[in-house]
Amino acid sequence: MKKFFLVIVLILVASGVFLLVNHQLKLMKYDFKGDSINGPVTMKSFDGEYKIAYFGYVFCPDVCPTTLTLVATALDDLKYKDVKILFATLDIKRDDVKTCDEFAKYFYPNSTCLRFDDKELDRVTKSYGVKYQIVDLKDSVMKYSVAHSSSIYLFDKKGRFVKEVSNLTYENVKKEIENLIKNH
């Protein structure tokens, strides 16, 4: 009987350790070290606010303005004030922190631009599953464009990943933000 009890205790301890390590790995997967208008930041810098992460770039002609407008409209309609949009630039050659931050705040005042170095951008986009590619535009003043995926990523107030939202209709985005606030 003692052996059985000991085995059960060991299984419970091992399960607890596994769950704790797994939880820490999930938190690390979505963490980052970047620059913002206020200096260096990590996901923890935004604790206390719900977060919506979005990857794009300032010179984006269509997807970024549309997505940021859609998210901002849903947030305004829901009247949620403690939600931060984290706009992570994919164009680190052209987007400086100040211009990027102004761009994000144009759509939603409680936004922050995140700018990463090459290595961190590569790591973060892989962790989040963001797809992007620099596309040469030979006969354009812009020289290149950035083709990219358009999902938004929802996080609770402690920086825990909640959901990736790729169906970016107004109704769906509003519903997913409501679910984030009500359930997390």
Where are these regions (language model features)?
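N-terminal "domain-start" segment that seeds a small globular fold
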Residues: 17-47, 69-70
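Structural microenvironment flanking redox-active thiols in thiol-disulfide oxidoreductases
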Residues: 68-124
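Cofactor-binding loop segments of dinucleotide-utilizing enzymes, especially the Rossmann-like FAD-
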Residues: 55, 90, 157
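Thiol/disulfide oxidoreductase modules built on the thioredoxin-like
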Residues: 122-176
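Hydrophobic membrane-insertion alpha-helices, especially the h-region
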Residues: 5-20
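Short active-site neighborhood of thiol/selenol oxidoreductases, capturing the structured segment around
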Residues: 44-65, 71
